[in-house]
Amino acid sequence: MTKITSYPAEPSDVKHFISAENMKNDHHLHTVLTFDNHLNISTLKKAVQLSAEKLPLLLCHFKETSNGASWQESVFSADDLVFLVETTTPDEEVNQALVKKLSTENGPQICLTVIRTKTSDQLVIILNHMLADGAGFKQYLYLLSDLYSKLLENPEYHVKLSPGSRGLKQVFDQFPRKQKHEILTKQKNQSPVQNPKIPLQGDANNPRIIWTKTSKQQFASLISYAKKHNATVNDVFFAAMALTIHQVTGQTAMSIDCPVDLRKYLPKNRTPGITNLTANITCQIAATDSLTSFEETLHIVKKSLQPQKNSLAALRIYYLLEIIFQKKSYAIAKKASEKLYSIPKTSFTNIGIIDEEKLVFKNSYLQDCFICGSLKYAPFFQVAATTFRGELTLSTNLHGTSHDHNWQADFLQKMIQQFPQT
């Protein structure tokens, strides 16, 4: 009898699984890559299959028992992973491909759909968020494009890929015992969460991803403004989002979730496996704060976020969960995860720069690429940002009514209008 290979589920995997169980989001990541010509489908299929050596969980199903959770190997062919849709209405097909659902319990954990017109292709990829965060997804895309390029050049190409570490333990191992104690005992000195009343009704049967772009000139202007005001681009994004929420809801008090990448704690020469290495901080704006100008709002945002950026307090929940999952039963650990991990209903995630030099598909020019997060269920609301070739894409995702989706599209435009000009 053949032994089934299994891989332990990390606490962060379980955390995302719980989010889907509790109807917060569908725990999928999404990307659209737009090319100037046709991809080689058979080469793409080979590349995806080879990439599973680096991330074997792609070809697994998730299994929970009373003893724990794991990823168990399944058998999938390339035809289960990559699909081709030939069409004269590419926008419609891209929208449909973007909202496909993966089956966590059955697998596979990735879906690639090539939307083909007579002259060009768009590649839509959906990845289970349990496997990777935004940075991990970019890491996977770079790997996929590299394998595709090498296989296109040499169809017999093969390489032995090592999965690497997926656990948060690799982050905590960087801290001496004294700092680990500090992580456990450091409490966030933060006001209670204030969720602004976003007017979303929700419709579980009507998912949609909405995105819009700014010009290179407008984004360059935003970067220049951030530098002049000793702020990060992320600070400017948060100020624009806070002002837009204030404009559309009339509320000043708000809490906006901000994911932070924990890879910064790893040695520079270490590349982790493709995984989730993210914690959360919160941008807090009080009812007494004055949001009368962009500059004032930026100052308030910086005052809230700056002390948290390098604070170990953000790691506390994740270190606690690592310990609980090690020492307690799975049932207790899962309940603890559900109780300890609670973030504001409104969030902004800056997935960051998609590196055009690392994302190269041989013989095809990549005209555009953006990544967006999971499809939310009301009242959860998120805006995501990515940049590619100096162009910014803002996106928002929701299982919602047509009225909800119109409201979200309008929100993105209002947010862009808040961007400062230099």
Can you say where each PLM-predicted feature lies in the sequence?
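Acyl activation and transfer enzymes in specialized metabolism, enriched
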Residues: 36-55, 125-142, 212-250, 394, ...
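Short, charged, solvent-exposed linker or helix-capping segments at domain edges/interfaces
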Residues: 83-84, 153-156, 360
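Secondary-structure boundary elements
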Residues: 117-120, 146-155, 228-234, 243-254
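Alpha-helix boundary/capping detector
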Residues: 70-78, 149-153, 157, 166-170, ...
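Non-catalytic, low-complexity flexible loops and terminal extensions
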Residues: 1-21, 29, 131, 135-138, ...
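Acyl-thioester-dependent acyl-group transfer interface
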Residues: 1-65, 88-110, 247-422
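Short, charge-rich amphipathic segments
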Residues: 22-36, 69-80, 155-164, 168-178, ...
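Acyl-thioester-dependent condensation/acyltransferase catalytic cores
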Residues: 45-135, 139-149
